[in-house]
Amino acid sequence: MSEATVWSDLPGELLDHIANGLFSKVELLRFRSICKTFRSAVDSDKNFLDHLKRNRRRLLSPYSTGKTCSLSPAAFYRVVLSSYPDKGWLIKLQDAYVSSQKQLLSPLSRFSIKSSGKTLDLLEFTVSEIHQSYDVEYLYYNSTRASFNFARVVLAEDFVFIVDNYKKIWLCNSNESDSHWVRIMDEEVKLFSDIVFHKGYMYALDLTGAVWWISLSEFGIFQFGPSSTPMDYCDIDECKDKRFVEYCGDLCIVHRFSRKFRIKRVDIDMTVGFKVYKMDEELVEYVEVKSLGDKAFVMATDSCFSVLAREYYGCLENSIYFTEQNNVKVFKLGDGSITNMVDSSFQSCFQMLIPPLV
């Protein structure tokens, strides 16, 4: 029989390392309540510098409107009951503008959720940050803020990169409020569908599915890997969108394809499936990922990432969650079917505080 761990005997260096990974006052309170040694190791007024730097709002130089704009961070959290940590919910929060409170957002979009009137005792829950996303907003009439609704916004070190609505990549230095936005492009390729900061490097995805590397020192852009990802379905369906997703440490490319349907005399473009590709380093080509195993992809409007399905209520493994026409839908890679979340009888990981709507 193995010996029980004596928490008070853990070395101070390890406790300090653990404390530096905390991101909220609630986590700090729970950490310090374990034993006297833990309380002595970390002050109750500890600042979360890394978290604050990553999550703070930043004033940016004016974009096309000529009006003041800012970087607006949001974070995805996994919330579980401390008494039952095996399964949980996915929520999305950002700092409120005029107070120290948090504002609840719809998980798969940035729409604000009005207060439900519920009060949660956070000491009964364990909250873990799992992913970060960003938006760029501008100030207009009556001090109201609005989003530019860029296709993607990424913070890499102190540089803000965006893919605008015309599929152009721009960047500015968030530390210099008078820094002008600079366009990133190649002589041959000027339009892109996505960008990502992955393992310390900045990558861009062009409209053909080719990956490009962006230098953070010179801001040049260079092709990385094969010239494109497969497009073997283009004779039947239109590739509606292409996105990066980090999956098991690899950078995958997700193709979302659609088809036009005529409903009530109106042509409607609807998603009919997804294909996932990853780089085969030996073959130096992209190969299709037929199964996500026990993972699921979350394709939010401002960020895409993978989760371990069994850690969330009602989350189906080997599936892709996305939004369409103000509904949350799930695509199953196993049989290629698409289901509305509102039609599901299962408890949803998005339903902790809100209905399963965008």
Curated annotation (Swiss-Prot):
In Pfam terms, one family for this protein is F-box
Residue stretches making up the F-box domain: 4-51
Record keyword Nucleus present: no
User: What keyword terms does UniProt attach to this protein?
Assistant: Ubl conjugation pathway
Q: Name one GO biological process term.
A: protein ubiquitination
Pathway involvement of the protein, from the record:
Protein modification; protein ubiquitination
Q: Which domain of life is it from?
A: Eukaryota
- The answer to keyword S-adenosyl-L-methionine applying to this record is no
Quaternary structure, from the entry: Part of a SCF (ASK-cullin-F-box) protein ligase complex.
- Function description: Component of SCF(ASK-cullin-F-box) E3 ubiquitin ligase complexes, which may mediate the ubiquitination and subsequent proteasomal degradation of target proteins.
Its protein name is: F-box protein At4g35733
Q: Which organism is it from?
A: Arabidopsis thaliana
